[in-house]
Amino acid sequence: GCSITYLTVTNGDLGDSTGTLDFSEIAALRREETMTAGKVLGVSDFLFYDLPDGSLSDIPSLAGRIAETIRTLQPDVIFCPDPWAQYEAHNDHIVTGRAAAQAFISSSLSRYPRGTRTAPWQAGAIAFYFTQKPNTVIDVTDTFETRFAAMAEHRTQLSEELLGLYRIYFSMQGQKLAEGKDFALGEGFKVLGPLHMHCFTEAPEI
C-alpha cells in the first residue's frame, strides 16, 4: 500500500451548476465532496490552498508554494494534469500542471523558493494524467468501478447523464490503452523524471 495526499489548489467556488448558492457555500460543498470522494479512493490526507476558481495566472508563485508542500511531504511521485495537452482549455488545470512541473524540478534546490526554511527534496517522478502521450499504462480493471463511485460524490459537478457519458468515454479509452496487454482496462500517464523536464528535447517522445 501507499499513503496518498490530495492537494487541491482552487476552492471550486465557480462550480455551482444551479446558480442558487453563494461563493462561500459552494466552496464549502466542493471541499466536502472532494474529501468524500477521496476517502472512497483511500486518500489519507487532504490539503487545500483555497484559491478562487478561475484566478490562477502566476505560475512562479504557485510553483513556489507547491515546492514547499513537496519539501514538507516528501512524496515519491507527484500526479497532476498534463498542462501541455493540446486543446486543454481549463486555465486552472493548465496553470496548476505547469506550476507542479516547475516545483517538481526545483524543490531539490536548497534556496528554492526564495526564503525557504524547508529542506530540499526531489521526488522520483511526476506523472501527468489526462495526457495525450502516455508512456505508462496502469491496469485499472479492478478499480474502474471504485473510480466512478468516487466521481459520483462530486454532485455539484457531475449530473447522472454526464457521469454516464464519462463512463462510456473512459471505458472506451481504457479498452484502447489495454490493447495487446493482459488486462481489460488501462489508464495512461506520462511519467517523467527530473532530468527529463529541463533541456531534454526528447521528452515528448519518451
Feature-to-residue mapping (PLM):
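Active-site rim/loop-helix segments in enzyme catalytic domains that contact anionic ligands
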Residues: 1-73
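Metal-dependent de-N-acetylase/amidase catalytic core
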Residues: 57-206
